[in-house]
UniProtKB/Swiss-Prot annotation:
Acts as a sulfur carrier required for 2-thiolation of mcm(5)S(2)U at tRNA wobble positions of cytosolic tRNA(Lys), tRNA(Glu) and tRNA(Gln). Serves as sulfur donor in tRNA 2-thiolation reaction by being thiocarboxylated (-COSH) at its C-terminus by MOCS3. The sulfur is then transferred to tRNA to form 2-thiolation of mcm(5)S(2)U. Also acts as a ubiquitin-like protein (UBL) that is covalently conjugated via an isopeptide bond to lysine residues of target proteins. The modification 1-thioglycine is found at residue 99. Belongs to the URM1 family. PANTHER family: RURM1 PROTEIN. The gene is URM1. It comes from Chlamydomonas reinhardtii. It comes from the Eukaryota. This is Ubiquitin-related modifier 1 homolog. It is found in: Cytoplasm.
Amino acid sequence: MVKVKIEFSGGLELLFGNQKQHDVDVPVQEGKQLTAGHLIAWTRDNMLRERPELFVKGHTVRPGILVLINECDWELSGATESTISDGDVVVFISTLHGG
């Protein structure tokens, strides 16, 4: 298990029970590392309450959602292949707003 703090903002929290912060234990296979892609799939399957099309597209987040791992843009560390470790903070921020 990997202990991760997940935060949602920019309206994404509405898809996750209207709760912005979650402390979760994510299972990983023996000898494997948790990746951001695996975390997204686990979050979709275990935490998402409604409208998955607003959070995921294929095996990643929808365009317009920023992902920060320990305050760093995940694009700098490999996006879905970024490694997530015990105690990491992963933030999902929607930049899309209706109008």
